[in-house]
Amino acid sequence: MESQQKCIVIFALLCCFAVLVALIFSAVDVWGEDEDGITEENCSKNCRAVLVENIPEDISLLDNGTAHVPLSVGLYSLLDRAIRVVEIVSPLWLLNSSDYESSFQPAARQGRALLSRLQGLKAKGIQLKISSGMIDSTELKMLARHNAEVHYVNMTALTKGHLLSSFWVVDRRHFYIGSASMDWRSLATRKELGVLVYNCSCLALDLHRVFSLYYGLQYRDFIPSFWSKRLFALFNKDAPLDFTINNTKAQAYISSSPDVFIPKHRSNDLEAISWVIQEARHFIYISIIDYLPLLSSNAHKYWSRIDGLIREALILRKVRVRLLISCWEKTEPLTFNFIWSLRSLCMEQANCSMEAKFFNPRVQRDGSLQGINHNRFMVTDRAIYLGNLDWVGNEFLFNAGAGLVISQPEGIEDRNSTVVEQLRAAFDRDWFSRHTRSLQANKIPICIKHQNNRPVPGKASHIDNGPMPIRTGQHDTAPAPMRNSHKDDGHTLVKTRYHDERPTKIDHQGFANGVVPIIDSYRERGQVKISNLDTSQLQNKGSYQDNPMDPPSQSAESSGSREMSNRSL
C-alpha cells in the first residue's frame, strides 16, 4: 500500500515536471537581445523626432509652417544610419509597382528605389530582419535571396486577425512608426504620416521587443502560455519614459494590440488612446481612416470603449473635438450616424464643440480613388498618439498593431519645437484644406455615392488605387484553434471580417466585362442589426439625398445652439 502511494506521488511529480517543461518551451525566446550592449539602464534619453509624410503630388496643401520630411527621404536616412541590423514590420510588401500595373506616376519609382536600398544592405554587412503576416510577396522572396531573415506570423491561427503593425527599428537606436506600409502607393499615391525618432535607444529598445515578439511567433499556431522576460515592456502609461525630445522634456511609451500579444508591463493600444483622451483639457483632434464603434459579426454590437470617452470629454469636460475621417469606397454608412450622434450631444449645450470632416480622395479616369488620407493619429493639448489601427472595434480585438504615445507639458517657451505642436499644425493644415468636406444633413457624401453608383473594384481594406491582380499565395492557411480565449469587457467573442490591404484576387473575365465583385470589410450591407445601442441616437437627420456635399470653404460645427457655422478659408 505504501509503495503504491509512493508511485502515485512520483507519477504526480513527473506530470508536474512535464507540464513545467512544456510551459518553458512554449514561451517565446528572444536571442541576441544584448549584442550591442544597450540596456534599459544605459540607453539614450536625449532624442530627436521628425515628422515624415507622403503627400501625393496632386494634393495641394496650404503652407502653414508645418515642418515635415518626405517619407522616402526619412526612410533612406534610417538606412544611412544603419550599422548592424534593420528590423521591419509591415502588413504589405508591394514595393515593385511594375509587378502590378504600369507606373503612370514618377513617384511610383520610389518603391523600387527603396527595395533596391534594402537589397543593398547585405553588401554593407547589415542584417535585415522582417516580420510579416502570411502573405505571398515577390519582394520578400527577393529579399530572402539577399540574406534577409523573413519570419512569417500566422495571425489567422493565432487571433483570426491580421498583422497590421508598421514600424522600423535600426540598431535599437533609431526607429520609425506610422501609417505607411512597404507599398509603393505609400510612397506615391497615398497620404501617409509617421514619425522618425533618432538616437533614442530607450524607446527603440522597447519597440524592438514588440518586433521580437512577432519574430519569435514564426509559424506558431498557438499563443504561448507566458512570455519571455526579454519581451516585457520597459515603459507604460503608469511608468512612462522620462526623456528629452527636440530639447524639450517629455514622457513616452510604446503600446500594442491585441491583448493576447501583451507581455507583462505593456500598455495596450486602447489603454493608450483612453489615457490621451482623458488627459486632454482643451482639444482633441483625431485623424483616422475609419471610425466605427461597433463589434461586427452576423449582428453588430455597440462598442463604447472610445466613443464613450469622446462623449465624456465633450459633455463633462467641455473639450473641443475635431474628427477628420477618410471618405472612400469602404466607408461604412453607419459612420455618419455615429458622427451625427456625437454632434447631437452639443445641441443647446454651452461650450460644447464637436466638428467632423471627411478627407475626400480624387476619382481617377478609370473610376478608382487616389489620395486617400491614410493617417492614424490623435493630438491633444497635452499629448499625441500615433498608431497602426483604425478606430473600429474588431481592429483592437484581433489585429496586431503598435502605437507611440508622447506627452509634453504646457508652458514650454518654444512650443513650436514640440512634437505635439508639430502634429497639431499638420492636423490644422489638413483640416482647413480644400480637400476636406463637412457632413451635412440630407446630403450623401460623395464617397458613398461613388460606392453605391458604380461597381466597386475588388480590393481589400485601405487600398486607394484600382484593382490589381494578386500573385497566387503559398502561405494561405485555414484558421486553427486558439489555446487562449478572447474577452472584451463582457462582450461576446466575434470573428473579424476585416480584410488586410493585399490586392484581392479578381475574376479577370468578370473584370473584362466591367463587373467586379464587391468585397465588404466589416459589414453586411442592408442587413445591419444593432444590439445594446440606443437606435434613436443613431437616427440620421433626414434621409440621404443624391446631392453633392458642401463646398470646401464650409465647416460644420455643433456648438451651443448653433447647427451650422460657415467659415471662409
Please annotate each region the language model reported.
Residues 1-477, 481-569:
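Charged, low-complexity intrinsically disordered terminal segments
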